[in-house]
Regions:
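Alpha-helical scaffold elements that line and support the substrate/ligand-binding pocket
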Residues: 1, 27, 76-106, 138-144, ...
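Amphipathic alpha-helical interface segments
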Residues: 44-66
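Solvent-exposed, acidic/flexible segments
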Residues: 4, 17-21, 52-56, 75-83, ...
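Solvent-exposed loop and edge beta-strand segments that line ligand/cofactor-binding
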Residues: 70-78, 126-132, 195-202
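Structured C-terminal helix/loop/strand segments within mature extracytoplasmic catalytic/sensor domains
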Residues: 195-268
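Active-site helix/loop module of the DD-peptidase/beta-lactamase fold
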Residues: 1-35, 65, 96-129, 133
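Active-site Gly/Thr loop motif
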Residues: 114-115, 163-212
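Flexible glycine/proline-enriched surface loops and loop-helix/loop-strand junctions
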Residues: 44-45, 66-72, 82-84, 120-126, ...
């Protein structure tokens, strides 16, 4: 589908709930205008992200139900709920779960062989998080984008989509594109972009240096099935007691401390 396809193509009831103008591009750019609170600290009350993860067996239905707050395309607001909407889009557009589609079209073609992408209790792939793989396989994904979506002699991701991904959203041109962060840590070239995951997972890509840097924290998935514990936050209100979590990065840990020395060595 076109990036400017209305989301009512996949969520037709939005047409009668004031959300008919929201496009797929708005969702990818985190600018759909939907109400959402991304506060992860349960001490501050039950935010949308806590509610979705802790109490909603069908996380996609919860994300879909969020009301419009502002006009789409007018404000950047990072939201796990917005990213979760992509799970429904992919499943309806392809007839496959998002993880199955990604395995066939992206992961297998680039050699990502050890991948586990979580689902909610209703069987929807968690497209806002929770893709477990190896550091080398994350690096493969970074290399795919470093090479403009091409892997060997195969164009795995359309080149024009890769270009759009890194162009910058209208209300966050130097911060966010289509599901990629575009901000530049101090001492790092301006063409840097990154994927940033939970608890210190990073894929940093710097095309001008032909460089991909992957950093994994010690986060380890809880043993058991690929389903997020619906009582995660309720059972473990303290952030450092949530099972499956590893060391917590210090408050002042930023990408520049990892990337800047590497960049300096490469450019000396």
């Amino acid at each position: 589908p076109s990036l400017d396809e209305p989301m009512t193509t996949w969520y037709p009831d939005w047409a009668t709930h004031g959300k008919g103008a929201i496009t797929l591009r708005d969702v990818l750019e985190m600018e759909p205008g939907l109400a959402w609170n991304e506060d992860y600290d349960p001490a501050n009350g039950v935010s949308d992200i806590v509610q979705m993860v802790a109490a909603e067996p069908d996380q996609l239905a919860y994300a879909e139900s969020r009301p419009k707050e502002v006009e789409p395309g007018t404000e950047f607001d990072y939201s796990s709920g917005t990213a979760m909407l992509l799970s429904g889009v992919l499943q309806q557009a392809t007839g496959m779960r998002a993880d199955q589609y990604a395995k066939e079209k992206i992961f297998d073609p680039i050699g990502m062989t050890k991948v586990d992408w979580w689902q909610d209790a209703a069987g929807h792939t968690l497209t806002y998080c929770c893709l477990d793989t190896t550091t080398r396989d994350f690096a493969r994904f970074g290399l795919l984008y470093l090479h403009g979506g091409r892997w060997g002699d195969r164009q795995v991701v359309p080149a024009d989509y890769v270009e759009d991904s890194l162009a910058g959203a209208p209300n966050s041109p130097d911060l966010y594109g289509l599901q990629w962060w575009l901000d530049d840590p101090e001492g790092v070239p301006a063409d840097h972009f990154s994927a940033v995951g939970h608890d210190g997972q990073y894929i940093d890509v710097i095309p001008s240096l032909d460089l991909v840097v992957v950093r994994n924290s010690t986060y380890v998935k809880d043993p058991g099935p690929s389903v997020a514990d619906p009582n995660l936050f309720l059972k473990y209100p303290s952030d450092d007691l949530i099972p499956g979590k590893g060391t917590i990065p210090p408050d002042d840990w930023d990408e520049s401390k990892t990337l800047a020395p590497l960049v300096a060595d490469l450019t000396d």
